[in-house]
Amino acid sequence: TAEEVKNMVEKAHQHGIRIVFDGVINHTGPVTPQDAVWPENWVRTTPACDYKNYKNTTACTLVANLPDILTESEQNVDLPAALVEKWKKEGRYEQEVKELDAFFARTGYPRAPKYYIIKWLTDYITEYGIDGYRADTTKHLEEGVWAEFKKQCDYTFTDWKKNNPGKVLDNNAFYTTGEVSGYNISGGLYYDFGDKKVNYFANGFNSLINFEFKNEAKKDYESLFSYYSNTLQKELKGFGVLNYVSSHDDSTPFDGKREKTFESATKLLLTPGTAQVYYGDESARNLVIDGTKGDATLRSFMNWDDIKNDPSTQKTLAHWQKLGQFRKNHPSVGAGVHQKITAKPYVFSRRYSKENYSDQVVIGLDLAKGKKTISTGIIFQNGAKVKDAYSGKETVVVNGKVTIDSEFDLVLLELKK
């Protein structure tokens, strides 16, 4: 319900958690006995996409029975009769029409289908103060639509902050990430349709989901970390990628059998860029379910009982939590510059600075269990008190090195507060 959404956003914000909604402009969902197809001046029902070029990816139906919004249209259209009837039954018709009139008067847009939908999606910002959108099926409509979408999201988010000064979390702008299916970080700024390359970062997106990470994660730590750092600090400077090891509609996850849960966490959460933790990654939720069809195997029930009763699951979860908290506390981990300090043992630093803020950490992986001495490079001064956030042990930097005695084979060094 609307009240439940409101409570969810408010509770999340009270805990410093931002809310990103999934936003769709490409379609209105499948046709069912309860949900009739929308009018023909709103949607097309043929042809089906064959993805061989730009047109056959955008001006077509994504899959069977998923009518495609005519996002290329600039023609005025009336509201669908079914929607008008619904609003009148709910007693909200006059208010909805009043808001639409105000939106089109302010923006100057024609009353084309895409602009109605943009207005309806920005309503979630106006009404709840959500912080961002994950744009679904991004490549299946013209990129310019997303530029207009972001423009209206920015306007609405600024307006919401002005009207709700007590609820503002920070000065950050509205966040957008795009699901451009098949986009890879190796493509840099562009996605290639075959006959046309599109820069979605120049059309309203802060970041794009990176479909390549699950394969890149097979590399050794240094190759992985240095490549992502260099790419994000150079070609993609100012933008981001959203990495994942498993996802709701990717049938080939990095660790489908959950045999590399610790490695999955270490690589996902310590690689530069943004990390998407799919539910159950942190608890080794089963992704191989007998009798399922398609992506249903990726959407199994959460393994709450394992978290409560299984020591192995609890150990896995603790690893994800420690890395996740360290990442949360240190922007340098995901947004900073990566620098190798020593190859053996493998130790590296991350440094981040912006305006009057700076953050730096030193991380060691595949170390000896027990007592270990590692170099901290130029990150911490001699005499500095540091803490290993993984074990909780504290020590002092001496001659550019620290010694930690812990049962673990990794260290997460931060300045002791």
Language-model region placement:
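Short, glycine/acidic-rich beta->alpha junctions
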Residues: 1-4, 116, 141, 257-261
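Active-site-proximal helices and loops of the catalytic beta/alpha 8
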Residues: 9, 13, 27, 119-237, ...
